[in-house]
């Protein structure tokens, strides 16, 4: 699972997801990509599940890039615990995703295989996504 090696503080405030993504909104490495259409949180487990779905479908052909990183901790209180008494302990890591962010990129495979692989990955993610290619951008 992806997680930061070191952090200055164990816990963070939740924050608000407003606006669209300016950085990371265009294809940089691959020919095809998966772009987010709405904002949301994606956990490190979901990132890994989508990556495995892509690599298995392309049968280890081509190259896959993950264009985001889970750098925000989320906390959880134990089961059957009353409210209050402070914030829960850190449970895992997730990434804050804004609309327009390119999540995954693929290069070295035909468009049909890339479209199928990224569609499989999209089913593993909690936010709606769209297939993009370099020809759409040009």
Curated annotation (Swiss-Prot):
Domain of life: Bacteria
Key words, A-Z: Ribonucleoprotein, Ribosomal protein, RNA-binding, rRNA-binding, tRNA-binding
Signal peptide span: none
GO molecular function, one term: rRNA binding
Gene Ontology cellular-component terms listed: cytosolic large ribosomal subunit
InterPro entries: Ribosomal_uL16, Ribosomal_uL16_bact-type, Ribosomal_uL16_CS, Ribosomal_uL16_dom, Ribosomal_uL16_sf
NCBIfam families named in the record: rplP_bact
Subunit composition and interactions: Part of the 50S ribosomal subunit.
Membership in a protein family: Belongs to the universal ribosomal protein uL16 family.
Protein's job: Binds 23S rRNA and is also seen to make contacts with the A and possibly P site tRNAs.
Protein name listed in UniProt: Large ribosomal subunit protein uL16
Gene: rplP
């Amino acid at each position: 699972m992806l997680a930061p090696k070191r952090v200055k503080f164990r816990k963070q405030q939740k924050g608000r997801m407003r606006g669209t993504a300016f950085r990371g909104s265009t294809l940089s490495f691959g020919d095809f990509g998966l772009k987010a259409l709405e904002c949301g949180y994606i956990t490190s487990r979901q990132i890994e599940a989508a990556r495995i779905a892509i690599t298995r479908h392309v049968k280890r052909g081509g190259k896959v890039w993950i264009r985001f990183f889970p750098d925000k901790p989320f906390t959880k209180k134990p089961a059957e615990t009353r409210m209050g008494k402070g914030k829960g302990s850190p449970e895992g890591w997730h990434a804050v995703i804004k609309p327009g962010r390119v999540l995954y990129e693929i290069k070295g495979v035909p468009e049909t295989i890339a479209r199928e692989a990224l569609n499989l990955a999209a089913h593993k993610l909690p936010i709606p996504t769209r297939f993009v290619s370099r020809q759409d951008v040009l």
